[in-house]
């Protein structure tokens, strides 16, 4: 009798473990990365928001393809003063943006993103480029440091 209960328990556990889960999104979801930019003086390396050269209210991020404004977040916590764009990569898309601050054209940002679907969705970035400005990428923090003269 004990062997029957043991066999039945093992069989039920096995069947439960092999249950087909058709909802792959519950297994994992990898959101696209946020793109962060620090605007610094090319000579001194000072953050141009921290030193008062630029003001957050004067930032304009524009989609070049249709001239529409693009939402961004300004991270001022602990004097980081970073521009963060978090809307790229939730779908397959090509994004071409320009960033102006205080009426000055600062840089262009281009992304070719492909959203890969499946049990573990993720974004494949085919191309990421910054033009019209010198920059450095901090690979540890993933912050693009835009060098402004």
Predicted regions mapped to residue ranges:
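Short amphipathic, basic-aromatic surface patches that mediate peripheral association
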Residues: 23, 39-50
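Bacterial Sec-dependent N-terminal signal peptides
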Residues: 2-6, 13-36
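Beta-strand secondary-structure signal
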Residues: 34-38, 96-98
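Tryptophan-paired
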Residues: 50-101
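Extracytoplasmic electrostatic interaction patches
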Residues: 86-149
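Charged, amphipathic alpha-helical segments
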Residues: 19-22, 40, 77-84
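Generic marker of residues within folded, mature protein domains
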Residues: 8, 27-29, 51, 87-89, ...
């Amino acid at each position: 009798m004990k062997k029957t209960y043991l066999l039945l328990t093992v069989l039920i556990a096995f069947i439960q473990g092999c249950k087909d889960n058709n909802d792959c999104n519950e297994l994992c979801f990898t959101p696209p990365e946020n793109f962060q930019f620090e605007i610094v003086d090319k000579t001194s390396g000072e953050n141009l928001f921290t030193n008062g050269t630029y003001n957050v209210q004067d930032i304009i991020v524009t989609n070049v393809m249709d001239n529409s404004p693009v939402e961004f977040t300004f991270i001022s916590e602990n004097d980081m003063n970073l521009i963060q764009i978090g809307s790229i990569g939730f779908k397959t898309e090509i994004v071409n943006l320009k960033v102006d601050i205080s009426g000055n054209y600062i840089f262009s940002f281009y992304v070719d993103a492909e959203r890969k679907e499946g049990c573990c969705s993720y974004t494949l970035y085919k191309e990421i480029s910054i033009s019209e400005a010198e920059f450095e990428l901090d690979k540890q923090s993933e912050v693009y440091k835009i060098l402004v003269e």
